[in-house]
Amino acid sequence: MYAKALQLELQERGIPFVAEQSVRVKYKGQFLGTHRLDLMVNEAVVVELKAVYDINNFHIAQMLSYLKASEKPVGLILNFSRGALDIKRVVR
């Protein structure tokens, strides 16, 4: 539900985004698989949506992997679990 609500808000504000975008993961030039990004906003920011107790190092490492695969410098982890929205900015 959080994803759909955020997509609606972005759409109403005219902010371009792609939901569930697949990005290729490569290692030494070889294709290994894909990551599926929750949102790519404005072709610049990777957004990952969570509903967890706390954002931890695993979530940050996951975002860094997404940033590397998508070749984007900035990502946001949005955690909806604790009543108030928790936002963590991650820079590659």
Q: PLM ranges: what are they?
A:
Residues 11-29:
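A short acidic/basic microdomain associated with nuclease active sites
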Residues 50-92:
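Nucleic-acid nuclease catalytic cores
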Residues 17, 37-55, 66:
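Conserved catalytic cores of phosphodiester-cleaving nucleases, focusing on short active-site segments
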Residues 3:
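Nuclease catalytic cores
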